[in-house]
Amino acid sequence: EAYRTFKSGTVHVNYQDPYLSRAAYRYASEDVLKDVPDYILHRLKETTNRKAAFINVATSFPDLMQGVDQKRATMARKAMTPKTRPYQDKILRTLKWSVVPYPSFEWSKKVYPEYDAGDGLMQFFEDLIRIMRLDEENPLDAFTKHLNYLEKIRRTLNDFHFKTLIYKGGGTDLTVDLPDAHRWVSGAQKRGKDVFLPNIPTEELFTVPEKNGVNGTLVVTKPMSVRGTIINPFTLTFK
């Protein structure tokens, strides 16, 4: 079905290669890293003005940026972010968008270290297919049922009117005060009459804390991949 949309000319593909980004961070001059080509901004302006829907098919290369000077990578991001932020904000706040995962060999090695690379990749695909209900007779109905379940839990959380959330375990000892008017939100969002999922798959139920109401220690016990660099378990302290 996705390929058939090309018949109406409604699909535009923007491909980004992280290996090219790595090469640029390593070898490009600082002037090149700081340069934001006009065509990038023109594309964002055109697509947002047309109220396009955005699908980001994202994968992860967990160790790709190891050995890269992060100051140079940060330099490039700092040049890009201010110029693209108005369009990114418009996408996030007014348009329909979704991020979906696509496994890579590198990613599967981290998730399934007990498998050979090829077998790990296939296992990754099989698990994603199951989690996204694509193995069901009617995947859309199955995922809609899941969203209805999340919506039921969301309403229950709102009915509790929690004052404070307390997290303990694994070294974590954290209290999170919630605003009186806080509301819980599930993974589905609306734009007019349309419903979309910012993240697929989704198990999300979330709210916001009181501005100065977070205190204690949060221990992240699983490695995280951030912009191509693995961050091992670490601790955050809030006061």
Locate predicted features.
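Long, well-ordered mid-to-C-terminal structural blocks that present hydrophobic/aromatic surfaces
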Residues: 210-239
